[in-house]
């Protein structure tokens, strides 16, 4: 890993905040409580790299508008960015959230946070009620039935977006190469991690094509994880991160 990324201000502050976040979770609920099981703070490494690749500053991207965290889980990054001075709007869907959004509310109360928390259904006709300078849309796209509609709608209300999702270079049986074409694989209900909320896994060119067709310009892109990736297996898990700018100009209502 590039030491300039590893020791960047964003990453260093994030790792310190992670320690505080984990302590708060221990005090906020019993040990049996079902917290989001993944480390959201590892996303700061690719986000910082994308930012550097594009030559942009976070404050420049956010501007004077709020930062939107779509798929906030327990609010790890929402509360972190609030600690950096950003006004944050954190959204998730209680119907699919592991603890029905109790976790994010418990942490908010413990922190005395002013983060605006909203329970939304992205596939249920969600329409942003305000404009955003920067959106975080991480690890959520493949949980959507209609990612095109959501990403297109977001491009009308946010100027910049950090997007990440699972991608695949090969079909599950590795007989069809997906990575050379803009394509998407539709998962069976039990095909990926036994999670019925997983739907579309794009090829890397497919994700770029989707973003462009939805009204975004791709400013920077990187991929992490498996090299011979597929849509279904743990060993074949690859993620693509994009830094996007709306091609529609300033967000409109």
Where are these regions (language model features)?
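Conserved N-terminal segment of class I S-adenosyl-L-methionine
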Residues: 1-131, 178-179, 222-224, 231-253
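Hydrophobic adenine-recognition pocket in adenosine-nucleotide-binding enzymes
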Residues: 140
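S-adenosyl-L-methionine-dependent methyltransferase catalytic module, highlighting the catalytic core
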Residues: 125, 132, 136-137, 145-252
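A conditional alpha-helix N-cap/helix-loop micro-motif detector
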Residues: 46-48, 143, 200
């Amino acid at each position: 890993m590039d030491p300039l990324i590893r020791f960047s201000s964003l990453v260093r502050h994030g790792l310190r905040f992670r320690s505080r976040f984990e302590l708060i979770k221990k005090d906020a609920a019993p040990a049996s409580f079902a917290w989001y099981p993944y480390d959201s703070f590892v996303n700061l490494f690719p986000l910082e790299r994308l930012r550097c690749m594009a030559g942009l500053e976070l404050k420049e991207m956010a501007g004077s508008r709020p930062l939107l965290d779509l798929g906030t889980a327990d609010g790890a990054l929402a509360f972190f960015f609030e600690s950096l001075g950003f006004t944050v709007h954190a959204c998730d869907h209680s119907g699919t959230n592991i603890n029905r959004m109790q976790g994010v509310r418990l942490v908010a109360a413990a922190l005395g946070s002013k983060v605006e928390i909203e329970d939304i259904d992205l596939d249920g006709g969600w329409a942003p009620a305000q404009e955003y300078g920067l959106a975080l849309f991480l690890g959520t796209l493949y949980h959507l039935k209609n990612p095109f509609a959501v990403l297109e709608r977001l491009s009308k209300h946010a100027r910049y977006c950090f997007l990440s999702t699972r991608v695949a270079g090969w079909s599950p049986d590795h007989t069809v190469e997906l990575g050379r074409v803009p394509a998407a694989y539709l998962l069976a209900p039990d095909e990926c991690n036994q999670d019925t909320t997983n739907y579309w896994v794009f090829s890397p060119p497919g994700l770029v094509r989707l973003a462009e067709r939805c009204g975004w310009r791709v400013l920077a892109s990187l991929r992490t994880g498996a090299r011979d990736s597929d849509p279904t297996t743990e060993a074949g898990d690859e993620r693509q991160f994009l830094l996007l700018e709306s091609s529609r100009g300033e967000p409109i209502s």
